[in-house]
Amino acid sequence: MMALALASTALIAAAGCGGNSEPAKSGAASGAKVTGQVTSSGSSALLPLVKDAAAKFKSKNPEVSLTLNAGGSGTGLKQVAEGSVNIGNSDVPAEKKLPAEKAKGLVDHKVCTMTVAAIINQDIADKVKSLTSQQLQDVFTAKVTNWKEVGGPDEPIVLVTRPTTSGTRALFTELALAGQEEASNKSLETDDSGTLIQSVAQTKGAIGYVALPYLVNNKDVAALAIDGVAPTLENTYNGTYKVWGYEHMYTKGEPTGAVKAFLDYILSDEYGVEIEKQGYGVSSKMKK
């Protein structure tokens, strides 16, 4: 069995690394030289976007060092509140993971929306394309334990679960499971979305859930519709698919220097065109 990584790390080395940099007016767009260091941790669901943005930002600002970790939303929020990282990435508002006094000191930067999809092993996908909301809840709470009970083959259901620190789990629990806690499967528990997909792909009868960006160009697993509605950006925008949330990048107080420049870049029109390409949603397109 593969090692289940609870954090995924990407280090983008600096050509030259300074200390604190002067605040940038709109990231690299101001034309001022940006130097310094940016550290982030948290949501594995947001990590692909953060890594992509960091690579593009780095190409424009070679003297900035960026160290990017996953580890789960709870971890990211805890670390940014403690000051051990500059940015804490989260799938849920800070108030849902931190005590009120700690959450109060954080500044929320909403960067995009994230759709979450239930995924299944391909050996189940031929017969099971969609589950009702009730069936999905019964599967993840272990009230249903065999796929034949929901129209699939005679195959035990294997849950691939996430730890309680996971923001993706918190969102899925609230919106897909109507607040019911999923049954635990410690032997296949991970908050690394890439590892979770591998586990579902390699385990007969497996089911789990991931953010939509992890399914872009991925044929190893199949996404389930809920009540006949597929987990797509279009269905998220028009309000028919309900399992989605805003992605947050928190700072302890207002950001300055390289951290501000990096966040300004992610929120810029220049980078905005890249968001949908990766499977994330543009907040302004959400149906009011």
Labelled PLM ranges:
Residues 18-74, 78-82, 86, 90-100, ...:
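Exported/periplasmic ABC-transporter solute-binding proteins
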Residues 1-4:
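Bacterial N-terminal signal peptides that target proteins for export
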Residues 12-16:
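C-terminal motif of bacterial Sec signal peptides marking the signal peptidase cleavage site
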